[in-house]
């Protein structure tokens, strides 16, 4: 079983409009509300793929109750309740544009943060792999993910970590390392304080920087150009076919689902990388975020090429 962790989930509200009119009333007919957050996208894709998954994280108030109720019934869930209210994230879809209004979310009390560590520690007993995704809510220390990774390491459970900014920096500077990180070029540039290109020789050098020491897997998305990966001392390039992109949002989360599944099933390097890329591409072909059509899985799988570089 895979444990997905979403520390700052949301109710994702979509308002489709033909035109967004400023400084007046906009009436919406077709409103959708879903349980949102990067970790919950991972959860949905794992469930659709057929892997056993347990979802956890922080929820609060009536919106927190709504969120838990609107996670697929096939998914096991064990969220931790806090005093603050789970946030809303609003997407206004107008024409070919999208305007987002994102609430900051609840402020987590220090004791709630400590109590969740105990909750997380207990959940580790029933899972084989951990996937941690997304931002930290206000109130938790910047190195909170390092604390989760430390507990998972002590329990012998591999961790796939998908976060960015100060939270990722804190983990990389910690002695407690996740098994996998999944930065993109922009995030690599931010971490190192210099521009990082997609040149493979440069990426090889970058991923051997001291900052990344101790990370078993580093998987870098190159968008339409595929993926570059480092596993131990071995480097890989994944070539992918061109596809019709409908909605790329959530493709990174779907990739995390594939990585986690590959670890769960102890797949070879090539199998893990292909699965991760295929699930990311399948998400991009769908209108709904964090959704894959498994009927198209094998046809895409057969087109990917993994080569050692």
Swiss-Prot record:
Keywords: ATP-binding, Kinase, Lactose metabolism, Nucleotide-binding, Transferase. It catalyses: D-tagatofuranose 6-phosphate + ATP = D-tagatofuranose 1,6-bisphosphate + ADP + H(+). One of its GO terms (cellular component) is cytosol. GO terms for biological process: D-tagatose 6-phosphate catabolic process; lactose catabolic process via tagatose-6-phosphate. InterPro entries: Carboh/pur_kinase_PfkB_CS, LacC, PfkB_dom, Ribokinase-like, Tagatose/fructose_Pkinase. NCBIfam families: 1-PFK (TIGR03168), lacC (TIGR01231), PRK13508.1 (NF010033). This is Tagatose-6-phosphate kinase. The gene is lacC.
């Amino acid at each position: 079983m895979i444990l997905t962790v979403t520390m700052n989930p949301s109710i994702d509200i979509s308002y489709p409009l033909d035109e967004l009119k400023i400084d007046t009333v906009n009436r919406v007919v077709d409103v959708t509300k879903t349980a949102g957050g990067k970790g919950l996208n991972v959860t949905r894709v794992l469930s659709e793929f057929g892997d056993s998954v347990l979802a956890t994280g922080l929820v609060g108030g009536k919106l927190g109750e709504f969120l838990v109720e609107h996670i697929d019934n096939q998914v096991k869930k064990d969220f931790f309740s806090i005093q603050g209210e789970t946030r809303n994230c609003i997407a206004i879809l107008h024409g070919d544009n999208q305007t987002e209004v994102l609430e900051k979310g609840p402020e987590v009390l220090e004791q709630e943060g400590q109590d969740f560590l105990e909750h997380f520690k207990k959940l580790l007993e029933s899972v084989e792999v951990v996937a941690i995704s997304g931002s930290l809510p206000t109130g938790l220390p910047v190195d909170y993910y390092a604390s989760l990774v430390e507990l998972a390491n002590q329990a012998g459970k591999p961790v796939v970590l998908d976060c960015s900014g100060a939270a990722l920096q804190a983990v990389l500077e910690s002695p407690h390392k996740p098994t996998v990180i999944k930065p993109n070029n922009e995030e690599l540039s931010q971490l190192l304080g210099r521009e990082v290109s997609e040149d493979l020789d440069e990426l090889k050098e970058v991923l051997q920087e001291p900052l990344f020491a101790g990370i078993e897997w580093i998987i870098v998305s190159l968008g339409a150009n595929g993926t570059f990966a480092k596993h131990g001392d071995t480097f890989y390039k994944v070539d992918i076919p061109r596809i019709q992109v409908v909605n790329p949002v959530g493709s990174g989360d779907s990739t995390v689902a594939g990585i986690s599944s590959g670890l769960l099933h102890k797949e070879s390097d090539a199998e893990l990388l292909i699965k991760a890329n295929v699930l990311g591409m399948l998400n991009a072909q769908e209108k709904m975020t964090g959704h894959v059509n498994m009927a198209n899985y094998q046809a895409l799988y057969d087109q990917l090429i993994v080569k050692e570089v």
